[in-house]
Amino acid sequence: MRSSVRRGAIAAPVALVLGLGVGACGVLPELPDPVPSDIVPSRAVTFAPQGGEQLSPDGFDAVQRMAVRIRNVGCAGLSTGSGFAIDEHTLITNRHVVADSETLEVSTYDGQDLEVSAASSARLADLAVVRTLDALPSYPELAVGDPRTGDAVSVVGYPEGGELTVTAGEIVGTTTDPLHENLGEVLITDAAVEPGSSGSAALDADGRVIGVVYAKTSDGRSLLVPLSTLQDVLADADAFTALPPCSS
């Protein structure tokens, strides 16, 4: 879901649209049964906080404040993606969002630019960590475990590199990760995502992180790296390598 201006239009529908980048697609095996065939992606909704005590002085909820827009200025062009804070100076996003970058530009919900100090990407999963010198305005809690089929899910990100949106849906199943089979299962949700949504946080009904958006299927479903995988990768000191400079 990295939105890019350096590639052509998305090709004909395939089983998986890798990263949801404009023109960045890969032909992969169809998702295995059973997966409901009558799921319709939900439309974008306006986030309505559950309680006024969660609002910041500027009127934005903590869930909105933790999401960031990531601009990848690479040797070959410009692309955009999303990310979210997990502590005051650490962001989670996708590996393909930050790959081949010359400069990473991070901005918050209110347009504030944050200086990036370092970035690293996971060797196996489509995950990356970005460190910022400037403090991030908010970060969410992590859920106690992975969600189950039927659980509510919201995706918070910056589709097309534009305004912050929150889309709602539910977990509709699981599948073997079509890109990284050794990592086991990933989650399938019908919450709507678009190019630029890669790296968005997927949240449960209580606003806790349950996964990371990384790809979209040709029938409009979204794939999530589950929380358990994210936690396992973050706990492995050897799982990440420093982001190499792009090649010109």
Indicate where each model-derived feature is located.
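N-terminal export and membrane-targeting signals
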Residues: 1-15
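C-terminal motif of bacterial Sec signal peptides marking the signal peptidase cleavage site
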Residues: 21-24
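C-terminal cap/linker of serine protease catalytic domains
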Residues: 26-60, 209-248
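A conserved glycine-rich beta-strand in the N-terminal activation segment of trypsin-fold
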Residues: 53-57, 66-88, 94, 113-115, ...
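Gly/Ser-enriched beta-turn/beta-hairpin loop segments
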Residues: 60-63, 117-131, 162, 173-188, ...
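Conserved active-site neighborhood of the chymotrypsin/trypsin-like protease fold
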Residues: 76-80, 87-165, 241-243
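Flexible, gly/ser-rich surface segments that form the specificity/activation loops bordering the active-site cleft
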Residues: 138-184, 194-197, 214-222
